């Protein structure tokens, strides 16, 4: 087994997946026409999701995928890229989407990251670019176990431990999810991780006109997972 590969038993199984939907009435006809003219994805949303699920199962059974020689693929992808999925995930250094989804090659997924996988303006712009210009047909907002940003938000709600500086602003974006999960059955942090992923998937779906349009015409799906 590759010594650089994370132990798959630690977390990297996709434990829960949720899908969000959008009514066509929310999007005007001019926007729908624009969406129809955008770059077509190489996979349908459901095909992309199935590919990620299969890759995750492959990773859990054979993490040696990280031994792949990426030099060849790096050369192949120098001039262009065509990712079929966009992943919004946490900056945690233990979370490596390319490995979690089966040792994917360069150019297959478009990854955007910040602490706590928050769909802020920068991340929404990145998601739009992946969907509109690169042809990504699936957006996954992915939380993870033992997330430090989510734990900090839970501590802020439960213990009043509010960090300062820009970290405080980041934690503040996750606090509403922690407030909703406070007192629920199960692990407080784990519940908040899932709720935070759900909320940011919902933000992605409702705040971005580009995402709305592509979802409405069936060329994009938005899901959340942990």
Model regions and ranges:
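N-terminal export leaders
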Residues: 9-24
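Divalent-metal-activated hydrolytic enzyme cores
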Residues: 14-18, 37-80, 107, 116-125, ...
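Boundary at the C-terminal end of the N-terminal hydrophobic targeting segment
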Residues: 33-35
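Glycine-rich, flexible N-terminal cofactor/catalytic loop recognition
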Residues: 72-85, 90-95, 105
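Active-site cofactor/substrate anionic-group-binding motifs, chiefly glycine-
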Residues: 91-104, 108-122
């Amino acid at each position: 087994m590759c010594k650089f590969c994370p132990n798959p038993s630690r977390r990297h199984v996709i434990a829960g997946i949720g899908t969000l939907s959008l009514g066509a009435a929310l999007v005007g006809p001019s926007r729908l026409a624009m969406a129809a003219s955008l770059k077509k994805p190489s996979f349908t949303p459901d095909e992309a999701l199935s590919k990620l699920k299969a890759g995750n199962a492959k990773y859990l059974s054979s993490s040696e995928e990280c031994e792949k020689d990426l030099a060849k693929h790096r050369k192949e992808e120098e001039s262009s890229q065509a990712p079929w999925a966009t992943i919004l995930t946490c900056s945690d250094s233990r979370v490596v989407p390319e490995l979690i989804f089966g040792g994917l090659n360069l150019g297959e997924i478009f990854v955007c990251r910040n602490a706590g996988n928050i769909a802020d303006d920068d991340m929404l712009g990145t998601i739009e670019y992946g969907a509109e210009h690169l042809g990504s047909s699936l957006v996954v907002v992915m939380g993870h176990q033992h997330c430090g940003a989510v734990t900090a938000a839970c501590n802020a709600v439960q213990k009043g431990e509010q960090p300062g500086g820009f970290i405080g602003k980041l934690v503040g974006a996750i606090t509403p999810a922690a407030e909703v999960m406070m007192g629920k059955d199960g692990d407080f942090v784990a519940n908040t991780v899932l709720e935070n992923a759900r909320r940011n998937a919902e933000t992605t779906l409702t705040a971005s006109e580009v995402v709305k349009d592509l979802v409405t015409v069936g060329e994009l799906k938005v899901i959340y997972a942990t």
